[in-house]
Amino acid sequence: YRRQRQMCIRDRYYTQEEIRSVIEYARLRGMEIIPEIDMPGHTRSMIAAYPHLSCFGEKTELCQFGGIFEKILCPGKDETFEFIEKLLTEVCALFPDNRFHIGGDEAPKTEWKKCPHCKARMEALGLTDYEDLQGYFTKRVVAILKKHGKRAVCWNDVLESKDVDTGNIIQYWTAQHEAPVPAFIERGGKVIFSNMSALYFDYPHGINSLNKVYHYQPVVMGKSYADSPNMLGYEAALWSEQVETPEHLEELLFPRLYAVSEIAWNEAGDYADFEHRAEKKIEIAAKQGVNCMTKDGWN
């Protein structure tokens, strides 16, 4: 997608060959790379390059910072799905893993509610709720992924629409949209837990402390899913738009990454014992040149 690449700041994009090299680097270390292309929200750069994919086709400047924006992909236009199919066909071929994250979070419906294309689509489908219009959008994208042998992963926001397919994996990040999560799990849906109140590592240690991470429990609406067969595990997130250097990145990760790694495999044990072991790990990491948060900043 040359137009979008030309608009990138400081050449911050990957060539296909670079993607392949990252995947191979991870494979040799026992890791899989799962791509995410968030949609219909968080598509500001996509719409800046291709304005016709939004509801009103207005020119949009490429954003220089993160945020939530009202201009999102238009589900009322057939060309939106034609573009997505071309995009996913190209990207799916690069990634061998059978999972593909399509986001679905933080998608304001402001423009959809004024858009004649969206209104026409809703009338044709017999929909009255704009969350269900997003549900329609999600189903269309999931169908494209299935043609490429991929299983969709979505943020838990998408559960605000009706009858989300339990073949999709839900990633729980926010209590704001947690009410539908238990019913999805009870229907057999699989969930990854990434609660922002503990497992978002772009938050400073003063907010999501090492102690808080170590004692995190996968609780939704007062119920623990620690022993549920539908709880796939934990994923810590680190959104990097405000991370300027590799050293800052490492400081945010360590030693919190040790904590989430331990509790993902075992129940939390004695925290003082964990802290002692974390200190030893930090000493080793520091000798390897890793910039870890010092102990006085852990909690």
Locate the predicted segments by residue.
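Single conserved hydrophobic/aromatic residue that forms the stacking wall/gate
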Residues: 1-9
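Anion (oxyanion) recognition and catalysis
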Residues: 20-23, 27, 146, 185-186
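Aromatic/hydrophobic pocket-lining residues that form π-stacking "cages" and hydrophobic walls in ligand
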Residues: 22, 33, 141
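Phosphate/diphosphate-binding loops
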Residues: 23, 37, 80, 84
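Glycine-rich, aromatic-flanked loop segments that form ligand/cofactor-binding clefts
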Residues: 27-51, 58, 189-192
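Glycine-rich, histidine-containing beta strand-loop boundary motifs that form or position
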Residues: 35-39, 104, 156, 195
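Active-site neighborhood of glycoside hydrolase catalytic domains
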Residues: 46-52, 56, 61-168, 174-188
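Flexible, acidic glycine-rich loops studded with aromatic residues
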Residues: 151-168, 174-299
